Amino acid sequence: MREVNFSIPNVNKASVNITTTLYDRRALDCTSTLPLINSLNHLAYLTTSSARIRDILTVDGGIERLVCILKEGRSGDLMEMWKWSLAFQCVVNIGVRGSESVRTRVVEADMVPVIATILDNYIKVVDKARARADSESHKQSSRHHPKSVPAPSDSSGRPAFLEQSSASENRTSRRQAPPPSIEIPPQPLFIDVTSPPRVPMTSPPERSTFGQDVHNHRTNDTRYAHPSHRHRTMQPLATALPPMDTADGFGLRPVRDNERLPSMLPALHTGLTSQPDSPTTPNAPVQPRSIAQATHARHRPSLRQQLSASGESDDGNGESSTMEDESTPAETAEPIVGLQNRMDIDDVGNREAIIGGVSESHDLTVTDPSEGQEAETFNITHRSTVDGSMINTDNAQNNAALGLSPAQAADTATSPALVPSPYSLYFRDRSTAAAQGVLTTMPRDEDVLMSLQLLAYVSKYCNLRSYFQNSHFVPKLKIDRELQMLEEGTSPIEPAEEEDEYLLPDDVNIFPLVEKFTVRHHSKDMQYWACVVMRNLCRKDEARGGIRQCAYYKCGKWEETARQFAKCRRCRRTKYCSKDCQKAAWVYHRHWCHSTP
C-alpha cells in the first residue's frame, strides 16, 4: 500500500492534506510536520464551521488521532508546538460546538487525562511562583526591618539623622552654588529623610513654580542613592495636607473643580508627560500621581473625576459579575478613592526617575501579554448597556482581556487577578536560555482556559462522571523534570525511564484540580469556567432517579433516595452527606459558593 507521504502526481502534492473544502482522514496520519500543520490549520476551521465534519471525526478515528498527537507531548521545537496547539484547538472545537453524542466521543477518546495534566502543570507553576514571591517579600521585609528603627536623638532632642542631613548639605554647598532660596514650610515631627522639604505646600498655581534647580540639588546629594524607608512615607503626606474634616471618605476634602482639571497645572505637565492637557486623556490619572510624588502634596481626586479622566461612564448601572456576590452601589460617596487608577504610595526611590523625566512605567493596570486578543474569545461576562462613546477604548480593551467590564474595573483593581502571568514571575532572574526552553513545554493561559471551557461543556453529563473522577496524568506532558531543572542549586536530573501511560492507575480526580482555579488569584475567565464545572458536579442524575452525589470529592457518596442530603444554605446548589464533609469542602467551596435570590 502506498504511503500517504509519497507524492501524488495527479494532484501535484507531496502528501495528502486537508483543505477548507476537502476533508481526508489520511492527512492526519502524515508523519511529516509541515503538511500535518497545514492540514490541522484547515481542520481547525472545518471543526468550527461544519457540524458534519465534527460528526465524521467521531466515527473515522479522527478524534483518537488528535488525542494521540496531544499525548506525544510539547516539544521545544517551534513547528512541534504549532502542531500541538492546532490539534488541541481542533479537539476543543469538536467538544464545545458538538452535540451530546460528539462530546461523549471526545471524553471516550481519552481527552480527560490530557486536560488533567495541563491543569496540574499550570497549578504547579503558579504555586512555585507564589512561593518564590512570598520568600522574596519576606527577605525584603527582613532586610528593611533594621532600617525602620527610629534613629537615636542627641541631647537637644533633635534626631541624629537630621544632623547628618544638614552636615551633608553643608558639604554639598561648598562644591556648587546654592540654589535659589525657597520658603520652607514647618517640618513635621517624623519627616522622611528622602522627602525634599524645599517645595512650599500651597495651592496648585503656587506649586507649579519649582524649577530644575531642586532636582539638580537632589541628584548631587548622596543620600538619595539608596532606597529609602517605605514605612515613613505616610507621615509627611498626612502632615502636608491642611486640616480637614475626617467624617467623609478617608479624611480627604473634596477636590475643587479648578484643581481636578489637568489644564489648570500647565507647568507641572512640562517634562513629565507628552499627553495633551485634557481630562479625557487615557493616562490622565497617572499625571496627578507623578505630581503628588514630586511635591508631597497629595490631593486625592473624587470618584467622578477618576471615572471621567479614565474615559469611563459615571453611571452605576454596570453589570453585576456572575462571579461576585456583592454588587457595586449606584450612589457612591464623592471622596471614595478605591479605584483602579488610584494613586498609591510607591517607593520613594522612584521619585528621581519621575522628576527627571525618565521613562519608567507606573501604571497599575498590569496585563499579561498572553491575554490579548485571544482572551476575548472566551469572555463570559455580560457587557454593560452604557453608551460606548463614553468608554475609553484602551481601558476597555484591557478589561475585556480579563473578562471584566469597564464599570467593574474599580471593584477589582486590587484583585490578585491583575498580576502578570505566573510564568513571567517564575522565570524572572533565571537563565534566559534555560527559561525559554522550559517555557515552551508549559501550558499557556489560553490552553488552561480552553481546557476549562471544554470541561464545562462535557462535565454536565452525569453518565460521563466516572471519566472525570477516575483519570490519570499523561507522562509525556508532565513538566516535573523541567521545573526542577530551573531550581537554584539543583543538579541536572537524569532522564527517568519513561512510564507506560496505560499501566498507570486511574486514581486522579479532576474536580479538585478544577476547584483550585476558583480562587481569586486566577483570572476572571478561569474562575468562571471552573465554577461552571464545579456546579456541573452538583447536577442530579436523572437516569438514576434524580439522586445527587456528595460534593466533597473525598467522599463521593450517592443518595439512596432523592433529597436525602442537605443542600448548602447559601448557594442552594451543592449537597453534602454530613456536616463533616461540608466543613472539609468549605476550604475551596467558599470561592464558588454564591448566594441565590
From Swiss-Prot:
Feature: compositional bias, Basic and acidic residues: 214-224
Subcellular locations according to the entry: Cytoplasm
The protein's role, per its UniProt record: Involved in determination of the onset of polarized growth and morphogenesis. Plays a role in the regulation of branching in hyphae and spore formation.
Biased composition (Polar residues): 271-284
GO MF entry, a single one: zinc ion binding
Residue spans, zinc finger MYND-type: 552-593
InterPro entries: ARM-type_fold, MYND-type_zinc_finger, Znf_MYND
Superkingdom of the organism of origin: Eukaryota
Ranges of Acidic residues composition bias in the record: 312-328
Biased composition (Pro residues): 177-188
Binding site for Zn(2+): 568, 571, 589, 593
Family per record: Belongs to the MUB1/samB family.
Gene3D superfamilies linked to this entry: 6.10.140.2220
UniProt GO BP: establishment or maintenance of cell polarity; positive regulation of flocculation; sporulation resulting in formation of a cellular spore; ubiquitin-dependent protein catabolic process
Protein name per its UniProtKB record: MYND-type zinc finger protein samB
Pfam families assigned to the protein according to its UniProt record, in alphabetical order: zf-MYND (PF01753)
Chain positions covered by the region annotation Disordered: 133-230, 268-287, 292-341
UniProt lineage: Eukaryota, Fungi, Dikarya, Ascomycota, Pezizomycotina
